[in-house]
Amino acid sequence: MAGSPLDALRDLPLADRAVALSWLGQAGFALRTGGTGGTGGAGGTTALIDPFLSPWDGRLYESALPAARAEGVDLVLVTHEHIDHFDAASAPAIAAASPEAVFVVPAPIVGMVAESGIAPDRVVGVQPGDDIELAGLRIRPVPAMHGVTMADAYGFGRELSGGLVRFLGFVLDAGGVRVYHAGDTIHFDGMEATLRDLEVDVGLLPINGRDPEREARGIVGNLSEREAAWLAREVAFDLLIPMHYDLFARNRGYPSHVVDSVDRDHPGVPVFVPPREHPFELGARR
């Protein structure tokens, strides 16, 4: 059997303070830090972020990472409960393949994650303002503005969750690189100030946007290509990596439009569009 994206990630030579990423499609990423520690056999910490690995009607391609082969994973980070971010069907198989893995999720969905078959003591609920370290990875949750359905969009989900924030992004100190995974979000007041204060180096931003036609079909939208380029400039990311644009035919975005927007309106913003499931290294920035 051919190697999985996690195998390729672990095989990539990595400096002590560098980080390697592999885009799994949609909002899914695998991440490995350099150095020692972790359970994956290659040193450092291995994390999955929003892994959507199950077959699903309407997917334009299948995942190249079977959940049962998600071995050596230390952390699974989940930004919110939508199927393409929290894949309840594959979560138990990931947990079985990586028995040391801890699931880090928004506090309002801890019960949902446990009910999928994850032992409760392996599920950590978090909120914006928390600052935790697990498996050598510093994790700082930040709010995301989204919705479970269009009926509650666009907000932070507090009204559904007893005042708690239901939709998150994560700022990760991965070696010498500070990475922001936005989850699903649109722009909101204070967003760029929060990210500037956290001194984010690399932004993983959704770019599929939103419009009345998709919203009428119940699709809660995200940043557009132009908005992602603008945010990257406002925060002064060292690198913008577009995501969440290619898995469903009726909810697409186009990274070429991000590049066009940068070229036209925000020169100087570096953009990298990674191929799926091919690991790449980011050197230390701090």
Which residue ranges define each predicted feature?
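Metallo-beta-lactamase
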Residues: A2-D16, P106-V177, S261-R285
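Pre-active-site segment of Zn-dependent metallo-hydrolases
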Residues: P5-L9, L14, A30-A96, V148-G157, ...
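Active-site-proximal beta-strand elements of phosphoester/diester hydrolases
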Residues: A20-W23, T46-D50, R138-A144, R178-D184, ...
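Divalent metal-coordination and catalytic microenvironments
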Residues: L31, D50, H80, D87, ...
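Structural motif
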Residues: T45-A47, D74-L75, V102, L137, ...
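Active-site environment of divalent metal-dependent phosphoester hydrolases
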Residues: P55-W56, H82-F86, V110-V113, D130-E133, ...
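Metal-dependent catalytic neighborhoods of phosphoester/phosphodiester hydrolases
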Residues: D87-A97, M112-I118, R250-D260
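Cap/insert and terminal regions of metallo-dependent hydrolase folds
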Residues: V102-V104, P108, I186-R276
